Amino acid sequence: MAANKNKNQSSLALHKVIMVGSGGVGKSALTLQFMYDEFVEDYEPTKADSYRKKVVLDGEEVQIDILDTAGQEDYAAIRDNYFRSGEGFLCVFSITEQESFTATVEFREQILRVKAEEDKIPLLLVGNKSDLEDRRQVSIEEARSKAEEWGVQYVETSAKTRANVDKVFFDLMREVRAKKMSENKDKNGKKSSRNKKSLRERCCIL
């Protein structure tokens, strides 16, 4: 029975999501809220924690693998390895901390550098702690402008109230899925072209 369960899970589509952003912006809180429906306020700084969950995405059962990475500068060197394995990224800042918003530029540049061979990288800009509106330092207009400049979606979340938590993970999975489908289509198209060319060559020889 366990073997069948593992077999079923391994046959599900797996989408790999990486959480990036400065320390203390709530990456772990967002992840834990999505995974377990609970708000964890005090959380030890993360080096890298991995989580996996089975979800239903637009009627299809899939698995999401979430890697929650450290925002601290001490871990900057090892982030490259984590970024290479990622298929989609949630670039998180706190709306109550201007510095964390400014830092998203550097995180995105690191992602683009590591994934330089890829075309469009699935990424969402996420402004967390929307429940702390009275302490806001980053305006919605400023964040939207940055997202528009990057060609990505901007969403505000609250790990505390769970506002838009599911939305950011599911929207990102949709982008990852669309990219995979596009890449598979391109591969199949090239393969088909090679087969036709090979067939024409064989016909000429005959």
Swiss-Prot record:
One cellular component term from this protein's GO annotations in UniProt: plasma membrane
Broad enzyme group: hydrolase
Origin: domain of life: Eukaryota
Segments of skewed composition (Basic and acidic residues): 180-189
InterPro entries assigned: P-loop_NTPase (IPR027417), Small_GTP-bd (IPR005225), Small_GTPase (IPR001806), Small_GTPase_Ras-type (IPR020849)
EC annotation from Swiss-Prot or TrEMBL: 3.6.5.2
Residues excised as propeptide: 204-206
SMART domains (UniProt xref): RAB (SM00175), RAN (SM00176), RAS (SM00173), RHO (SM00174)
Locus of motif Effector region: 43-51
GO process terms (BP): signal transduction
Record key words, sorted: Cell membrane, GTP-binding, Hydrolase, Lipoprotein, Membrane, Methylation, Nucleotide-binding, Prenylation
Reaction(s) this enzyme catalyzes, per UniProt: GTP + H2O = GDP + phosphate + H(+)
Protein name: Ras-related protein O-RAL
Species, as recorded: Diplobatis ommata
